[in-house]
Amino acid sequence: MNHLVTASMVALSVATPIAASVAAPGAPHDKLVVGMTAFSSSQHPYIDPVIVKSWTLGFVNRPVTYFTPDTWTNTCALCTELPSIENGRAKIETQANGKPGMSVHWTLKPDLKWGDGVPLTTKDIAYTAKVGGDPTTGFPDARIWGRIYKTDIIDDQNIVVHIDEVTPLFNRMSKLLSEHIDGPTYTAAKSPGDYVKQNAYNRAPTTPGLWNGPYMMTANDGASQIVLQPNPYWSGSKPYFKNIVIRSIGDTAALQANLLSGDIDMIPGDGNGLSLDQVLAMQKQHPTDFNYIFNDSVTFYHLDVNLDNPILKDPRVRRAMLMAIDRKAMSDRLVGGRYQLAATWVPPKEPMFAEGIPIVPYDPAGAKKLLQEAGWTPGPDGILRNAAGERFSIEYDTTTELKLGLLIQQVAQDQLKRVGIEATIKNEIQRTFFGDTLKRRKYGGLAQYFWLFSVSFAPLQLYAISNIPTEANGWGGSNYMDWKNDDFERALQASATDLDVGKQKADWAEMQKIYAQDLPTLPLFFVPQTHVIPVWLKGYVPAGMTDYASLRGEDWRAE
């Protein structure tokens, strides 16, 4: 699972009518001001990954490979050819310890340079692999960089990396660190944690030699604003804007006010921006002042089910709970039908999506029947009881900050009560909910939040048995449900090692089938990204996943 897995939700706010201030026709647009609600003080590509930073770095630090926005297909950004078994660039080999591994031959495009004119070479790949494989550096991307145990530099453009496992992720390579700028800091680090604090990206983020994209970071006040300007050594399409300003504005109400007043030009939907309901209200009030884009995404909104609770161990009970919730009505009434109902965690646009997995329908009568089959019958107060007289009463948790989530929770609570299930709301601030309650399984029944997935990334972190948080593993992993399904585990582990695309799809289809039957989480919706951009901005193509629209920032222009 993911490198940048984000667990958060969008907030509800009532849009206040404000007259929109837009530039006069013919006015020059050589500056683009982007507004977000968050800011990252760290600019290191891997340490402390957050959405706003990754979105910003799309302009200035290009990965070796990325997924295209239209078909979500892995493709080269800095390389000449995507390695594969078929073209001979990837091979299975035997490691010195006798275990199978892989060798992968990468070739960088010619004329790549950092922002100071120094050539970008295979030394930068080797350096990034070295830092990424060091457990003291704080890299979360262990399955991308940590699996590389050796690099063989052939020349400045060619390198062979050796991977300690057989994995379908062999031909993915993310952002590179600048060896000639950042390397001395890593070499000088004397104790664990020194590099995390002193790396060049955090100390001097406006150093030109840190960046290899169409833009460079030329100003960073460390609190609320970053300025990007064209990289004179960029070898690709010439970027249009002289300045791109990324500005952090405290909350969504202020963000919207700044947009309507003209202080900012746009709010991206793949960053920390406006909620769906805010954008819908704004579109109604200002239909022609901006372009509004709603695109499918990998954002999976769901309810984790605590399987430590004996009441919730029966799959029939979990299915009945999902049948009791009218997800379509929620989507229609709260967000104008923009939520896409989910059958599993895999969205239809995902290349590994399995056709034929039915979406559990809203069927309260069927839910009552299933609950009765599972041994639950109504008590005198209307709440179900089992043969031992135990009431069907569970806790229902989400975060206090997210207003639209609270509305969804209230509707679901009421609908569950109609079939005899008492769901007691127990909400917490995000820091407590994500930092303690989920991973220690302190929630008593249901936990409502969303995940943002990477494309075709085997969901080991979420569903592998080894990723059930425990005291023994330092409460690591995100299988917060304590889900143990041997059939799913076999398909999951196979999906993480099968190189044949056909076999991978079969593995994923099996996982989706088992998930839909067992329902360790209750799938609710896929949440679309909502982008508000100026009518004069062209070339803006949102992706709906973690390879953000900024990765094609050189194509943005004003017309």
Residue spans for each PLM region:
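Gly/Pro-rich hinge or "lid" segments in bacterial periplasmic/extracellular proteins
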Residues: 66-73, 177-239, 243, 253, ...
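Detector for C-terminal structural segments
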Residues: 30, 36-38, 51, 55, ...
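Alpha-helical secondary-structure segments
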Residues: 33-36, 121-128, 156-162, 213-214, ...
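Short helices/loops that flank or line small-molecule/ion binding pockets
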Residues: 117-119, 124, 253-264, 281, ...
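Aromatic- and charge-enriched surface segment that lines or borders ligand/interaction sites
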Residues: 82-138, 160, 255-258, 311-313
